[in-house]
C-alpha cells in the first residue's frame, strides 16, 4: 500500500499529525482518510472493470465484423468463440423479457379464474337457500 514511503516517513507523518491534530482528533482524521482512500480505490476498480468490459465488447464486435467479411463458414477458432459468446449474450438478454411476458400472461388468466370460482360458489349457496 505504501510503495514509495518507508518506515521513517510514516513515523514522521504520524508525529506531525499528532502535533497538529492532537491525540483526540488524530484517530478520527485517520479513519476519514482511510475511508476516502477506500472510496477512491472502489471507484478506480469500477472504472477499470467498465473499461475492460467495453474493450471486450469492442473486440467481440471487431471479431464479428471480421467473421462477416470472411463469411461465417471458414472461421478461425477464436472468431467462432467470439460469435458463440455474442450469441449467448444475446440469448441471456432476451430471456428475462420472456420470463416477464410469461409471468404477466399467466396472472390475468389466474385472476379471471378466481372470480369465476367465487361466482359459482355464490350461485351454489343461493340455490341451497332457495331449497331450504
Curated annotation (Swiss-Prot):
The Tat system comprises two distinct complexes: a TatABC complex, containing multiple copies of TatA, TatB and TatC subunits, and a separate TatA complex, containing only TatA subunits. Substrates initially bind to the TatABC complex, which probably triggers association of the separate TatA complex to form the active translocon. One of its GO terms (cellular component) is TAT protein transport complex. The keyword Phosphoprotein does not apply. NCBIfam families: tatB. The chain crosses the membrane at residues 2-22. It comes from the Bacteria. PANTHER family: SEC-INDEPENDENT PROTEIN TRANSLOCASE PROTEIN TATA, CHLOROPLASTIC. Gene3D superfamilies: 1.20.5.3310. Residues 109-124 have a biased composition (Low complexity). It is found in: Cell inner membrane. This is Sec-independent protein translocase protein TatB. Belongs to the TatB family. It is a single-pass membrane protein. Residues 90-132 are annotated as: Disordered. GO terms for molecular function: protein transmembrane transporter activity. The keyword Cell membrane applies.
